Design a protein with these regions (language model features):
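Active-site-adjacent structural elements that line small-molecule/cofactor binding pockets in enzymes
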Residues: 1-202
Length: 202
């Protein structure tokens, strides 16, 4: 289901194609709804894109918001946050560890080896969508970047305050996080860019 009649390309296949016709462009999902995806396949696809692009893949992931979309994909909408946390552990291990196994409430992975590994070590960076307190905690634990969706410049600061606090609890700082915001206003372009830049985002 979509809010518009504009279709969206499947991201991993699209990024693989883009990897073959570019040399320096960073390639990321913005975002892949991880609780809808099999984590083993997502890890395999991500590693392939990272190899094809020689280490330019960004794993942009999020929870999703549409129960209708989850139903269409045949995946449960409930407990998607807890499911995503387990999937993140599985994907991270498959990318970073020589052997992987996992036993959780929503996913079990017998001991296995996934090859080839990504170029980026220990693994491609995770960027996260979402603006809730839980989302900020997830970024602080796993992330290298944050995608803010349709936020006005004045709405960015409270999220960054929350994120800074969560990062500090883990001995991290905001300087370690790439901040990317999709515009949520109709300001002229130059004024808009200046307003977001004052908040530290691109």
């Amino acid at each position: 289901p979509s809010l518009t009649q504009v279709g969206l390309m499947e991201p991993m296949a699209t990024l693989a194609a883009m990897a073959m016709c570019s040399k320096t462009l960073r390639l990321g999902t913005g975002i892949a709804i991880l609780p809808q995806r099999n984590p083993v396949y997502f890890a395999k696809e991500g590693a392939a894109v990272d190899l094809l692009s020689n280490g330019r893949f960004i794993a942009g992931v999020g929870l999703g918001w549409s129960g209708q979309e989850f139903a269409a994909a045949g995946t449960p909408f409930e407990h998607r946050g807890s499911r995503m946390n387990e999937y993140l552990e599985v994907v991270r291990s498959l990318w970073a560890d020589e052997t992987s196994s996992f036993e959780g409430r929503f996913y079990s992975l017998p001991e296995c080896i996934q090859l080839p590994k990504p170029v980026q070590r220990p693994h491609p960076p995770f960027y996260f969508g979402g603006e809730s307190e839980v989302a900020m905690r997830r970024i602080a634990q796993y992330g290298r970047g944050w995608f803010g969706l349709y936020l006005k410049p004045e709405d960015v600061a409270p999220r960054l305050t929350s994120l800074t606090e969560e990062l500090a609890k883990r001995g991290r700082s905001l300087s370690e996080i790439d901040l990317v915001v999709s515009p949520g206003n109709d300001l002229p372009v130059e004024r808009m860019l200046e307003a977001y830049a004052t908040q530290g985002v691109s």
